[in-house]
Amino acid sequence: MSSLPMFDSVSRFLPTANEDEQFWWKLTGRHMARMMHEAGYPEDRQVECLLFHRFKVVPCLGPRPHSDKPWYKSRVGGGAADGCPINYSWRFGTSDRKPHIRNFIEPLGALTNTPADPLNEVATKALLRDYSMTLPNVDLELFWTFAPHYRPRIIEKADMEKLAGASLLVGAEMSPDSRNIDIKAYMYPRVPSQTSQLLTTILPQAMRDAYGEDVCLDSLNLVRDFMTNDPEGSQLTLTGTTGIDCCKLQDTRVKIYVITRNTSFDHIAAIMTLGGRRPISEELLNQLRALWFELKGAPADFTSSEQLPAQTKPDGTKNPIVVPFYFDIQPRLALPDVKAYVDVSTSPVSDLAAAEAVVRHLERHGSGQNPKAYMNVLQDITPVEELETRKGALAFYSIAVKKNELDITSYFNPQVYKRYFAHEVQLNGQRRSAFE
């Protein structure tokens, strides 16, 4: 793999860091540098984003690993992850746009995993406030308005202990042709009753509080109607997860995440088109079907009305397939955008085969720019033999329709804990991490 001159130059003049920050910088800083290098980011943008990562992300990643078991299991990365508080995404983009990279973190602080901060909110809110003071494009008005609506109103200690866990995540998008770093926040209601009230009570009131009493809720109401009355939409289940943009109020989006357990492609297509309300060309639906079947290990002629077979785990039990989506709500738009997620961790195909399938699709249809650069990134983070034989590097592929082509993003994990002893050596009877 080629060298990373920007990472080496930045590292050369950094002040001495503590052991934890030094570990996270050497590992995740190199990952970020590799992604930007392969994506063709301008050199000055690479330096800018690396400095942001070093001073605004790395200090929030907590103690360095000292075993293959996380001291706090972060929610970042979904079911494929190993508890590491950071993962990455590579948006292939479209034929006229370079790849965009992002990272997602759950900030960890002094109060994380203690009774003083059972929902792990303190470090995240402090980080967001810091971003709002140092990044001129960041505006937290929507976040501060929404956050109280998602917080559980519980005073009983036993109840709070049951609900302890991640309630907030932060995403940072670093596009190649901008001076901005775009921040996103993700909220998770911990009380089940809050999730069931999301579309009927919580979101309508939160949006009125944020945008004003006369805010147009047509897009939100359409989602609620679709999930209530449409035979396909009524099979969706709210997860409670809500994503928002931390920018000027007039430009913000609200993302509502749902899942379905119906894995037939006809059902997937019905959700993507909102039951025909958002038409997608037959050509694009055919592309989506072919990619869906390939990523899920189904033959190309698999019947579109049939359910995909569940994967059998090593212990003989079945691994049910869940398909996530999100609806992108914007008050100024009557129709929400829809994005589907393909969970690679529940697929019988290897991580390498899944990645190669996506690259073939992009090359076949002339989409994206230099999709093989993505393979260089994956193989730099995880050895090829592990991509071929193990699961966990890839989390999801998301698929949306933009400008009459499929817009695909890959979400992948550094596997800091899972690979801790991957290349262990014996040194004076001690195990030694491959990252040391």
From Swiss-Prot:
Please state what class of enzyme this protein is. Answer: transferase
Q: Which UniProt keywords apply?
A: Transferase
Pfam families on file:
Trp_DMAT
Asked whether the keyword Nucleotide-binding is assigned, the reply is no
Which pathway does this chain act in? Secondary metabolite biosynthesis
What processes in GO biological process is this protein linked to?
A: alkaloid metabolic process
Q: Which molecular function GO terms apply here? A: prenyltransferase activity
EC numbers: 2.5.1.-
Indicate whether Coiled coil appears among the record's keywords. Answer: no
**Matches recorded under InterPro entries:** Aro_prenylTrfase, Aro_prenylTrfase_DMATS, DMATS-type_fun
Q: What does this protein do?
A: Prenyltransferase; part of the gene cluster that mediates the biosynthesis of neosartoricin B, a prenylated anthracenone that probably exhibits T-cell antiproliferative activity, suggestive of a physiological role as an immunosuppressive agent. The non-reducing polyketide synthase nscA probably synthesizes and cyclizes the decaketide backbone. The hydrolase nscB then mediates the product release through hydrolysis followed by spontaneous decarboxylation. The prenyltransferase nscD catalyzes the addition of the dimethylallyl group to the aromatic C5.
- Which PANTHER family does this UniProt record tie to the protein? INDOLE PRENYLTRANSFERASE TDIB-RELATED, PRENYLTRANSFERASE ASQH1-RELATED
Q: Which family does it belong to?
A: Belongs to the tryptophan dimethylallyltransferase family.
In its UniProt entry, what is this protein called? Answer: Prenyltransferase nscD
Q: Which organism is it from?
A: Arthroderma otae (strain ATCC MYA-4605 / CBS 113480) (Microsporum canis)
